[in-house]
Design a protein with these regions (language model features):
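Short amphipathic helical patch at the helix-1/turn junction of helix-turn-helix
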Residues: 21-22, 42
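Alpha-helical structural segments
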Residues: 4, 8-15, 19, 33, ...
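Helix-turn-helix DNA-binding elements, focusing on the entry/boundary residues of the two helices
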Residues: 16, 27, 38
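Short amphipathic alpha-helical leader/targeting segments
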Residues: 27, 45, 53-55
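Conserved hydrophobic/aromatic packing and binding residues within compact polymer-binding modules
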Residues: 9, 30, 41
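Ser/Thr-centered, proline-biased regulatory motifs
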Residues: 23-32, 49
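Short hydrophobic/aromatic patch on the recognition helix
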Residues: 35-45
Length: 68
C-alpha cells in the first residue's frame, strides 16, 4: 500500500509540474490533488526536492531500460 501511495504521489506531481510549472506547485497542492494529508505525503517524501529527485531517478531508470 505504501509503495502504491508513493507512486501515486510521483504520478500526480509529474502531471501537475507539467501542467502548472514546477515552481507553482507545492506539496500541499499535490496532497490536495490526491486527497491525502500533507503528513501522509511527508511520510513518503522529505520535501518537494525529494519528489523531484525521485522523478529524475524514475526517468533515468526508464531511459536505461529503453536504451538497453
Amino acid at each position: 500500500m505504501a509503495r502504491q501511495t508513493r507512486q501515486r504521489i510521483l504520478d500526480a506531481a509529474l502531471l501537475m509540474f507539467n501542467a502548472q510549472g514546477e515552481p507553482n506547485v507545492t506539496t500541499n497542492h499535490i496532497a490536495d490533488e490526491l486527497e491525502i494529508s500533507p503528513g501522509n505525503l511527508y511520510y513518503h517524501f522529505r520535501n518537494k526536492d525529494d519528489i523531484i529527485e525521485q522523478l529524475f531517478q524514475r526517468y533515468e531508470e526508464r531511459m536505461d531500460t529503453a536504451l538497453a
